[in-house]
């Protein structure tokens, strides 16, 4: 799933994880999300010049997933998805949600993931990772018209 994230988001990522998989996958996957979210926050930096918002609706065969991101610095996570099996390969399906929650809070992003159509659980999960990648790529893209942080906080409204 992380390979799909890096390829479709056009990100360079190398991950080496040592976990307690002999117990279960919870800590390993959650900690990977925390570390990735922290690394993203650090890589994004002061956010000057980036678009801040990104979204993607991505089809994967019968599945359709929406992902929307706001790199506001205020973590918030909305999940509207259900899996019909307990596992996808060696991964607990409940850990997909925990992974994205961990990234969201560690990075300080507002993250919404919603399954619009589903079927095959692997396709749904893969579409989640790829739509997240494309939304994050859009949100972190530079725009020469944005000369500072894209925000209206601290601005006074002038009524004419």
Please identify what each model-predicted range represents.
Residues 2-19, 26-29:
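Polyanion/phosphate-binding surface patch
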Residues 3-5, 48-107:
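Intrinsic, low-complexity N-terminal interaction/targeting segments
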Residues 12, 46-53, 110-114, 139-151:
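Flexible, glycine/charged-enriched surface loops at secondary-structure junctions
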Residues 18-26, 116-122:
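A short glycine/serine-rich beta->alpha loop
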Residues 30-51:
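Ordered, amphipathic secondary-structure segments that act as subunit-interaction surfaces
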Residues 74-78, 88-143:
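Mixed-charge, glycine-accented linear interaction segment located at domain edges/termini
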Residues 158-160:
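Conserved small/polar residues in nucleotide/adenosyl-binding loops
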């Amino acid at each position: 799933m992380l390979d799909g994230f890096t390829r479709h988001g056009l990100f360079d990522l190398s991950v080496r994880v040592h976990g307690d998989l002999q117990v279960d996958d919870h800590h390993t996957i959650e900690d990977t999300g925390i570390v990735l979210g922290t690394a993203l926050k650090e890589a994004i930096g002061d956010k000057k010049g980036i678009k801040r918002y990104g979204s993607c609706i991505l089809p994967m065969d019968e599945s359709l997933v929406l992902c929307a991101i706001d790199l506001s610095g205020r973590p918030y996570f909305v999940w509207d998805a259900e899996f019909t099996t307990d596992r996808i390969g060696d991964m607990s399906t409940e850990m997909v949600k925990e992974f994205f929650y961990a990234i969201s809070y560690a990075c300080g992003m507002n993250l919404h993931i919603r399954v619009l159509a589903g079927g095959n659980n692997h396709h749904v999960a893969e579409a989640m990772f790829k739509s997240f990648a494309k939304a994050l790529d859009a949100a972190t893209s530079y725009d020469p018209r944005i000369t500072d942080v894209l925000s209206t906080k601290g601005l006074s409204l002038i009524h004419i």
